[in-house]
Amino acid sequence: GDAEPQWHPTNPDVLYYVPNNGWGMTITELNVASDQRRVVGDLGARLKSFWPTAATAWTKSEGAPSADGRYWCLMVDNNQWQGVGVVTWDMKEDRILGRMNLPARPDHVSMSPSGQYCVVSWAHNRELGTRAYTRDFTTPHAASAARQPYVKLHEQSEHSDLALNKQGEDVYVAIDYQADRGDVFMVNLKTGKRTSLFPTYLSGTATAIHFSGKAYGKPGWALVSTYGEYHASNQASSLRNTAMQQWMHRKIFAVSLEENPQIRPLAHADSDSKSSWGSDAYWAEPQATVNSDFTRVLFNSTLNG
């Protein structure tokens, strides 16, 4: 199961994790140097008081706390993996700050780097899409004309991440496969403004993509990794080392979070999977991530494998 490890923002010996897929609704601190553990958040009784069938509390593998590690956004499931609610939790004060009943189970949730917003992302649900809620789920969002407690960031749930722009503001970075150019874009969580960064539908091709915005100490940059590219004329055929392969395919690169962004290639992510691997083929995706000051990058590859 997924323990969702999250490193302490300043102590490299400490991380936080949830039990197997959030069962038990606790958050534990682990010192990897001493192997000492302590429960820093036992949310079970409180969550059951809101939702009697509550059984798990997690981000569903794709979320993170605020950049300072204080604020957490968690989705709550029952023992049948049906979503019942979302909460925000203050680790410093061990206090529930807000909660919301769920109209449908999200694909994942995450706290924004600033700790001001809980981003809830629903897959295959254009009405709900991906939304940035105010931390208590009741205060109207400043960018909502209808005085709702959220702004809609996207009509889909795509591979995405939350990052900080150069001004230190929260942004949502994702790809829009429904756009004419398959744009990679960002949305400012405070203003709701969307900015296109670069197209991905190049010369009849498309690519799968991941983002990491975890370089909070280097605001204004995100990490991008691509894989699984294809041409519209033959989606089953690899473009590797052909004239149809484009500049971004099979790459790890940094992108500045601004209009007309800088693109800085970092590495080749020459990774392919085999159908015989079954579900393990998922781990052939590069899924690149970056450290807090953008001096280290980690990614998967099957090159020469």
Please give the residue ranges for each predicted region.
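Structural motif
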Residues: 22-29, 80-88, 126-138, 179-186, ...
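Blade-terminus and WD-like Trp-Asp/Gly-His loop motifs, strongest in beta-propeller folds
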Residues: 3-15, 51-72, 108-120, 153-174, ...
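Short loop/turn segments that connect beta-strands within beta-propeller blades
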Residues: 31-35, 90-94, 136-143, 189-192, ...
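Surface-exposed loop and turn segments in beta-propeller and other repeat-based domains
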Residues: 1, 41-55, 146-156, 192-209, ...
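Loop/turn-rich, solvent-exposed surfaces of beta-rich toroidal or solenoidal domains
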Residues: 199-271
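Blade-level signature of beta-propeller repeat domains, shared across WD40, Kelch, NHL, RCC1
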Residues: 281-305
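Asp-box/WD-like beta-propeller blade repeats and closely related beta-sheet repeat scaffolds
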Residues: 24-111
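Acidic, serine/threonine- and glycine-rich low-complexity intrinsically disordered segments
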Residues: 98-208
